[in-house]
From Swiss-Prot:
<dbReference type="Pfam" id="PF00137">
    <property type="entry name" value="ATP-synt_C"/>
</dbReference>
<keyword id="KW-0812">Transmembrane</keyword>
<feature type="transmembrane region" description="Helical">
    <location>
        <begin position="35"/>
        <end position="55"/>
    </location>
</feature>
<dbReference type="GO" id="GO:0005886">
    <property type="term" value="C:plasma membrane"/>
</dbReference>
<dbReference type="InterPro" id="IPR000454">
    <property type="entry name" value="ATP_synth_F0_csu"/>
</dbReference>
<comment type="subunit">
    <text>F-type ATPases have 2 components, F(1) - the catalytic core - and F(0) - the membrane proton channel. F(1) has five subunits: alpha(3), beta(3), gamma(1), delta(1), epsilon(1). F(0) has three main subunits: a(1), b(2) and c(10-14). The alpha and beta chains form an alternating ring which encloses part of the gamma chain. F(1) is attached to F(0) by a central stalk formed by the gamma and epsilon chains, while a peripheral stalk is formed by the delta and b chains.</text>
</comment>
<protein>
    <recommendedName>
        <fullName>ATP synthase subunit c</fullName>
    </recommendedName>
</protein>
<feature type="site" description="Reversibly protonated during proton transport">
    <location>
        <position position="84"/>
    </location>
</feature>
<keyword id="KW-0375">Hydrogen ion transport</keyword>
<comment type="function">
    <text>F(1)F(0) ATP synthase produces ATP from ADP in the presence of a proton or sodium gradient. F-type ATPases consist of two structural domains, F(1) containing the extramembraneous catalytic core and F(0) containing the membrane proton channel, linked together by a central stalk and a peripheral stalk. During catalysis, ATP synthesis in the catalytic domain of F(1) is coupled via a rotary mechanism of the central stalk subunits to proton translocation.</text>
</comment>
<keyword id="KW-0813">Transport</keyword>
<keyword id="KW-0472">Membrane</keyword>
<dbReference type="InterPro" id="IPR035921">
    <property type="entry name" value="F/V-ATP_Csub_sf"/>
</dbReference>
<dbReference type="InterPro" id="IPR038662">
    <property type="entry name" value="ATP_synth_F0_csu_sf"/>
</dbReference>
<dbReference type="InterPro" id="IPR020537">
    <property type="entry name" value="ATP_synth_F0_csu_DDCD_BS"/>
</dbReference>
<keyword id="KW-0066">ATP synthesis</keyword>
<keyword id="KW-0406">Ion transport</keyword>
Length: 101
């Protein structure tokens, strides 16, 4: 019983605070679009890690077999281009959120 009263008290306080804060947040749409753009650009982190792993694999492959350097390099460039598309999409969404919305 004690937990039920405690949780209902916390929930009532939370909803009371949100009823005051939420209308102010919704009117400040200019600031929220920058937060959304920042969250949209989180996709760039995976691209950086992926391209680092691609470069590492290419360097290891060329180190093991230097004769295949041209094929490994061309495959590495194609793979880096494919992984870069996620960062470009994230950047486009962030720019749209900042300048269009």
């Amino acid at each position: 019983m004690l937990h039920t009263a405690f949780i209902s008290n916390i929930l009532a306080n939370y909803l009371g605070a949100m009823s005051i804060i939420l209308p102010n947040i919704l009117t400040v749409s200019g600031d929220i679009k920058y937060i959304g753009a920042g969250l949209a650009s989180v996709g760039i982190l995976g691209t950086g890690v992926g391209q680092g792993l691609i470069g590492q694999g290419a360097c290891l492959a060329i180190g093991r077999n230097p004769e295949m350097a041209s094929k490994v390099t061309s495959t590495m460039i194609v793979s880096a281009g494919i992984s870069e598309s996620g960062a470009i999409y994230s950047l486009v969404i962030a720019i749209l959120l900042i300048f269009v919305v």
